[in-house]
Structure formats: C-alpha cells, structure tokens
Amino acid sequence: MADTGYYAGYQDDVDVDEQKRHQALYLIGIILLVTVCLTVLWVCIMLACYVPGFLKKTLEAWLNSSSLMKRRVASTLTRTPFEATGPERERNWEARRQSTTVNPASQPNTGSVF
C-alpha cells in the first residue's frame, strides 16, 4: 500500500464529503435566496406605506402654498399662458363655456380623449 500522507486510520470518503458540501452549499443558497426575497418584500411594503404619506404631505403643503406658485404649476400643466390662470379665469368661465357651445367648430380636434 502506497503512503498517501495520511495516518493509517484515515478512510478516504471523498465522494461522501463532496455530496455533503454540495448539500450544505445548496442549503446556504436557499437560505440566502429566502433572506433576499424577504428583504425585498419588506422594502416594497415600507415604500408602499411611505409613498402615500409623502404624497399627502406634499399636496397639503402645495395647497397651503402661495397662489402664485399654483398658477405657475397650473399654467405649466395645462399649457395655458400664465396670465390666463388666476381668479379672472374662474370669473370668465361662463363666457368661455357659452362661446364654445355656440361655435364648437372653431375648437381644434386633437383626436384624443384627454
């Protein structure tokens, strides 16, 4: 028998050790995967709880802000000239509404609902 460098009582269980190592690595991989999935789920839940509160605070702060800022945002969103936004816009609503019902052909049709 050739000297393998091990003591005489050692039994070479390379196949068994390799299978155990493979199972241990597989188990560690599953545990890490479950941990990552739970962490991602927790982050999604925290974001789902945080975002509505953030939006509420932001909108409340915006509603309490100056009317000048609201007019600028409204003119940007609606692509209306800044001068056409404001209290006189609401006062002129009836006149504008009647003019569009009298002559609807003058309004350009963009083909979209919104």
From Swiss-Prot:
Cellular component annotations (GO), alphabetically ordered: host cell plasma membrane; membrane
Gene Ontology terms: biological process: transport of virus in host, cell to cell
Lipid bilayer topology: Single-pass membrane protein
Record's subcellular location: Host cell membrane
Biased composition (Basic and acidic residues): 86-97
Location, primary (coarse class): host cell
Keywords: Host cell membrane, Host membrane, Membrane, Transmembrane, Transmembrane helix, Transport, Viral movement protein
Transmembrane segments: 27-47
Composition bias type Polar residues, residue spans: 98-114
Residue numbers spanned by region Disordered: 79-114
Function: May transport viral genome to neighboring plant cells directly through plasmosdesmata, without any budding. The movement protein allows efficient cell to cell propagation, by bypassing the host cell wall barrier.
Family designation: Belongs to the nanovirus movement protein family.
Protein name: Putative movement protein
Taxonomy of the source species: Viruses, Monodnaviria, Shotokuvirae, Cressdnaviricota, Arfiviricetes
Gene name, Swiss-Prot/TrEMBL: DNA-M
